[in-house]
């Protein structure tokens, strides 16, 4: 599994060759630099560490400054490991979107979903509420209803769907097609939506 780090730019829409309307997401993918190459001999597994998005030196910790200096690159904000790069890579090498992907590829996109705060069961789990407001009912339309029996089992089971914090979790959207690659701007256009808000980091995995 090879991939690259990107930043969500926003959503738009295009028409495909047949004339179908396709909603899509624009992602700024790279350029990323290789800051570490892990091998079985030294680390116990094989992986490549990529870094993306420049960062001020004064905002970087000294251990990380040393790490970037060893790779011969300027400080970066986001560091992620990827496994599965087949071709030979060198420390400090730059990887752009067109080096990893071509138009028509199907990719998985990983990101952090927007935080929604404390939400009820209708929004959080898609409950239908408890029916019409009849027979005197006036304040239970969007409540969960029963969460268990009384004397048996005399407890609420783990995992029962209730109100609570929604979003702000890691989400992977699979099998999104790359509709267009713009090498001059390091942009990918993928079909559908991806998790996160504008300017949030995403991982594009092949």
From Swiss-Prot:
GO molecular function: rRNA binding; structural constituent of ribosome
Cellular component aspect of the GO annotation: cytosolic large ribosomal subunit
InterPro entries: Ribosomal_uL3, Ribosomal_uL3_bac/org-type, Transl_B-barrel_sf
Keywords linked to the UniProt accession: Ribonucleoprotein, Ribosomal protein, RNA-binding, rRNA-binding
One Gene Ontology term from the biological process aspect of the record: translation
UniProt-listed SUPFAM superfamilies: Translation proteins (SSF50447)
Family: Belongs to the universal ribosomal protein uL3 family.
Known role: One of the primary rRNA binding proteins, it binds directly near the 3'-end of the 23S rRNA, where it nucleates assembly of the 50S subunit.
Quaternary structure and partners: Part of the 50S ribosomal subunit. Forms a cluster with proteins L14 and L19.
Name of the protein in question: Large ribosomal subunit protein uL3
Lineage: Bacteria, Pseudomonadati, Bacteroidota, Cytophagia, Cytophagales
């Amino acid at each position: 599994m090879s991939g690259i780090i990107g930043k969500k730019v926003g959503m738009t829409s295009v028409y495909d060759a047949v004339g179908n309307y396709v909603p899509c997401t624009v992602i700024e993918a790279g350029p990323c630099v290789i800051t570490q190459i892990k091998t079985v001999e030294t680390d116990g597994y094989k992986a490549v560490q990529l870094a993306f998005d420049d960062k001020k030196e004064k905002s970087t910790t000294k251990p990380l400054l040393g790490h970037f200096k060893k790779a011969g690159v300027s400080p970066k904000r986001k560091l992620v490991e990827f496994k599965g790069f087949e071709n030979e890579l060198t420390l400090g090498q730059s990887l752009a979107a067109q080096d990893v992907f071509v138009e028509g590829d199907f990719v998985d996109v990983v990101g952090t979903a927007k935080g929604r705060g404390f939400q009820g069961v209708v929004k959080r789990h898609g409950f239908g509420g408890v029916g019409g407001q009849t027979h005197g009912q006036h304040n239970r339309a969007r409540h969960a209803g029963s969460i268990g029996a009384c004397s048996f089992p005399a407890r609420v089971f783990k995992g029962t769907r209730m109100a609570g914090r929604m979003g702000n979790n890691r989400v992977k959207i699979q099998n999104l097609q790359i509709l267009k690659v713009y090498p001059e701007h390091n942009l990918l256009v993928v079909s559908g939506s991806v998790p996160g808000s504008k300017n949030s980091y995403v991982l594009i995995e092949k």
